[in-house]
């Protein structure tokens, strides 16, 4: 019975992993309805989850796991989450309601487009859009509604929901004319509560697990503490920007302002990305000229744009806007540097006079101009990769021979890691200050954040786990390589309203920390496969296990915190979006490595290392593959 339950549980989980992988591909090829019909809502899919949960719990009880409180709590928490999801699937309702200003309705449309009746009426009193300061990018959408007949008035906005009689209303969309609002409606009085209880139990159990005695994690930690392996290191040279050929012209051009990337920024941002010649050539197409309307709202125009009627009534202003870019081009062509500077300084003076309320502060401009000159980590990634490869090979040789590096070598490596970490901290900090948002969205941001975590891991762990140095530098090098391919000055844009949530910050940080740790495990697996000594392979397996537990727990925490954020933002804590599906796949795949006690192959060091190398493909697909190939709601981060 015990053996049967074990095979049923792990077998069902393995089949579910394959089904979810296939479902994301089918969704891309044949559409979401087909994927839900064939996979997510199919009887087989539900049965497999039930078998995995029930058989797994029975096996744990028969194996004596209840004696280990937190280990049992981990698995029980997952079972409670599945129970809540089943209740939501069977009894929950969700859809949307479309209201025009002044309109009252007592029904909404379900996801299958059938009507559903509300036990009350809802009226839209007003709808409004807030914009980022000096930008046309929305910062929030607001619907003022009244529930009738009670007359309860509430305001719904992004990440600010309304709850009424067991129903929840979320700001989902709006009409193009700004006179209508579309609200998402969710009615799931039991499923959400059960699922949240599972999340809480899971979180408490993950924290308690690290204090639990006689676990595989504790055994691996003790083995690693007695290892003799160590690693070495070299030197860092920070990158230096090249000087411009026509320094004064480039400086004057860079100090102007431009409306670019849905925000007002120094022209230097565009200049560093495109180069001086291209910037001058496209000057008439750049939004350099702010104009205020009768209400005082400032909009930015290019010389080639259709200008407001008021400009044509002011001949001097019209001439200034239309002719200034042409004068700059002509002066550059003729080598008249003084003429170029005169026109550029005139444009800047006009900008400061007309748009003083929306242009960035001098301190923020200085920060951005510094940032764009150091944002591309080309020298840093090449250094990290070179050192990582050398130390990786050298470390493998030393492990095989059971030798240590001198302590001064490890200290030298830590100094280099510190310099890289300080550089990354400066770049991330400057970008954060300029944009006003943390490094949580976009490939450049996330890659730099992963490199930051990798170098921080070196600084924190190199004394106890010397192998962290080559592994950390390899990971930092690869992630900075990917970041450098995003352009000289990666675009800074205001965040979409739905992304302006502190839960998103914690969610992304948790996910990126887990991905960083999985990357370290993958590199450690490569070394484990390469070394000829069986004892060395076992030592490296222990290192991987010590890293694997916090990595899996961070991924689990991040995934379910993302579900809470999604539920708050748009009323659905799980939508089988390709990104969240692959995050779940990754979590399940890596969880197999933590069950060596039940799964004999994972007690074999060579198999374990090969598995961790292959498993990292799931991380790559989750982050890169989904954004580039599969799409879905999370593709905003691409």
Task: Tell me the role of every PLM-derived stretch.
Residues 1-638:
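Solvent-exposed, non-transmembrane regions of integral membrane proteins
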């Amino acid at each position: 019975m015990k053996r049967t339950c074990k095979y049923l549980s792990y077998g069902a989980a393995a089949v579910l992993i394959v089904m979810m992988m296939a479902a994301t591909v089918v969704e891309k090829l044949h559409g979401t309805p087909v994927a839900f019909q064939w996979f997510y809502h199919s009887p087989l899919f539900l049965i497999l989850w039930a078998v995995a949960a029930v058989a797994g719990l029975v096996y744990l009880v028969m194996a004596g796991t209840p004696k280990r409180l937190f280990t049992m709590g981990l698995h029980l928490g997952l079972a409670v989450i599945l129970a809540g999801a089943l209740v939501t699937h069977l009894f929950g309702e969700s859809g949307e309601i479309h209201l025009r200003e002044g309109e009252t309705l007592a029904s909404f449309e379900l996801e299958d487009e059938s009507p559903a009746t509300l036990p009350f009426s809802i009226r839209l009193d007003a709808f409004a859009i807030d914009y980022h300061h000096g930008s046309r990018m929305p910062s929030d959408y607001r619907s003022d509604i009244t529930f009738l007949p009670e007359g309860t008035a509430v305001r719904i906005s992004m990440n600010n929901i309304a709850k009424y009689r067991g129903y929840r209303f979320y700001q989902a969309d709006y009409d193009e004319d700004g006179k209508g609002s579309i609200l998402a409606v969710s009615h799931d009085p039991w499923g959400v509560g059960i699922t949240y209880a599972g999340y809480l139990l899971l979180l408490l159990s993950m924290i308690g697990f690290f204090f639990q005695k006689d676990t595989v994690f504790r055994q691996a930690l003790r083995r690693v503490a007695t290892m003799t392996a160590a690693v070495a290191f070299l030197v860092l040279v920070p990158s230096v920007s090249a000087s411009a050929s026509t320094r004064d012209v480039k400086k004057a051009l860079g100090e102007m302002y431009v409306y670019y990337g849905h925000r007002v920024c120094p022209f230097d941002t565009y200049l560093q990305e495109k180069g001086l010649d291209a910037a001058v050539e496209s000057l008439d197409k750049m939004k350099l000229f702010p104009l205020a309307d009768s209400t005082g709202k400032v909009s930015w125009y290019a010389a080639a744009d259709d200008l407001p009627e008021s400009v044509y009534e002011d001949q001097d202003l019209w001439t200034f806007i239309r002719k200034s870019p042409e004068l700059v081009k002509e002066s550059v062509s003729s080598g008249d540097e003084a003429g170029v500077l005169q026109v550029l300084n005139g444009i800047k003076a006009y900008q400061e006079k007309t748009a003083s309320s929306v242009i960035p502060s001098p301190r923020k401009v200085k920060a951005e101009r510094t940032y764009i000159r150091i944002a591309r980590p080309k020298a840093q990634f090449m250094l990290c990769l070179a050192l990582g490869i050398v130390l990786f090979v050298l470390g493998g040789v030393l492990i095989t021979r059971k030798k240590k590096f001198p302590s001064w070598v490890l200290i030298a490596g830590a100094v280099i890691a510190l310099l890289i970490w300080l550089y990354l901290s400066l770049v991330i900090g400057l970008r954060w200050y300029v944009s006003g948002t943390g490094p949580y969205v976009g490939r450049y941001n996330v890659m730099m954040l992963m490199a930051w975590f990798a170098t921080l891991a070196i600084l924190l762990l190199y004394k106890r786990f010397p192998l962290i140095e080559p592994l950390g530098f390899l990971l930092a090098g690869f992630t900075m390589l990917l970041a450098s391919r995003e352009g000289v000055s990666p675009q800074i844009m205001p965040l979409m309203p739905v992304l302006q949530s502190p839960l998103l910050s914690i969610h992304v940080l948790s996910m990126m920390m887990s991905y960083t740790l999985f990357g370290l495990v993958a590199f450690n697996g490569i070394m484990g496969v390469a070394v000829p000594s069986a004892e060395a392979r076992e030592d490296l397996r222990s290192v991987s296990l010590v890293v694997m537990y916090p990595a899996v727990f961070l991924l689990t925490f991040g995934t379910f915190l993302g579900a809470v954020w999604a539920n708050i933002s748009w009323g659905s804590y799980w939508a089988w979006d390709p990104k969240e599906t692959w995050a779940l796949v990754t979590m399940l795949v890596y969880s197999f490595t933590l069950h060596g006690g039940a799964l004999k192959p994972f007690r074999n060091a060579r198999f374990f290392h090969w598995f961790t190398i292959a498993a990292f493909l799931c991380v790559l697909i989750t982050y890169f593959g989904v954004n580039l190939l599969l799409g879905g709601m999370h593709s905003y981060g691409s």
